[in-house]
A protein has these predicted regions:
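Residues immediately flanking
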Residues: 1, 89, 134-136, 153-154, ...
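Surface-exposed loop/turn segments and immediately adjacent short secondary-structure elements
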Residues: 1-143, 157
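Conserved catalytic palm subdomain of right-hand nucleotidyl-transferase polymerases, strongest
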Residues: 12-15, 85-92, 141-150, 189-220
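Short, contiguous clusters of charged residues that form electrostatic/catalytic patches at enzyme active sites
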Residues: 33, 76, 110, 160, ...
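Structural signal for hydrophobic packing residues in well-ordered secondary-structure cores
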Residues: 39, 43, 116, 166-170, ...
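Conserved short loop/turn motifs at secondary-structure junctions
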Residues: 92-100, 178-185, 212-218
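A short alpha-helix capping/helix-loop junction motif
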Residues: 126-127, 171-178
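Conserved pre-motif C helix in the palm subdomain of viral-like polymerases
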Residues: 143-174, 192, 216
């Protein structure tokens, strides 16, 4: 059964930009290069946002975001995480860190201390396994797959702790027009508002323009 499952999920060939890749090494390099190009930043141009009047945090809120990490804060974030997710390159699931917290907490807190003092971490900490999940049966083109990254447990924990800190203040700096990814707001509200706008135009026999953008935010 395991061998059959592996055969069904193996990727012997793939089409990238209209070109078929069949050799294992070519498939690996082709996929890696495609996503590297997709996710790379154009260093020649950056948007100038200095003239925008953006909401900002108070000095106290900014300082709170940069406080040293406490054991209670890290442990609380760890216990909130789903322990059953697939392990990353380090081979440890989140459940391992949860169950063995009393034994590993000193080393983990030392990692958080180094990160706080140096504002950086070892490159190996966020090493990932890139896994392609087919969006439909018979997927052949790279666009027919959805990539997911299997991250190590410690990197997930670090991200969780930082996210918990940001939750406390993010509502102050995110526009009230954004409905997604903010606690207390529902993405469905945006669809309802769009329908109301279209309905209003039709009733008043007015013309309008709606722009649907497939975009995402990033933090540099």
């Amino acid at each position: 059964m395991a061998n059959a499952h592996r055969r069904n999920n193996s990727l012997d060939k793939i089409k990238i930009n209209g070109v078929w890749l069949t050799k294992e090494q070519d498939v690996r390099e082709g996929i890696a290069n495609a996503y590297h190009q997709m996710l790379s930043e154009n260093a020649k141009w950056k948007a100038d946002i200095r003239g925008l009047q953006l909401d900002h945090l108070s000095l106290q809120e900014t300082e709170n975001l940069e406080l040293p990490f406490s054991e209670e804060e890290v442990c609380s974030a760890l216990m909130e995480m789903n322990g059953d997710k697939a392990p990353g390159p380090d081979g440890f699931t989140v459940a391992f860190w949860q169950d063995c917290w009393d034994f590993v907490k000193e080393e983990v807190m030392e990692m958080f201390k180094d990160f706080h003092e140096q504002s950086s971490f070892l490159k190996s900490l966020n090493t990932t396994f890139l896994v392609l999940i087919p969006k439909k049966g018979g997927a052949e083109d790279l666009g027919d797959f959805r990539p997911i990254s299997l991250l190590g447990g410690l990197y997930k924990l670090l991200a969780k702790v930082l996210a918990n800190r940001l939750k406390k203040v993010i509502g102050k700096v995110v526009s009230s027009n954004q409905n997604a990814f903010v606690m207390g707001r529902q993405i469905l509200d945006a669809s309802l508002i769009a329908n109301e706008v279209i309905d209003s135009w039709r009733k008043r026999k007015e013309k309008g323009l709606i722009c649907k953008l497939d975009s995402y935010d990033n933090i540099n």
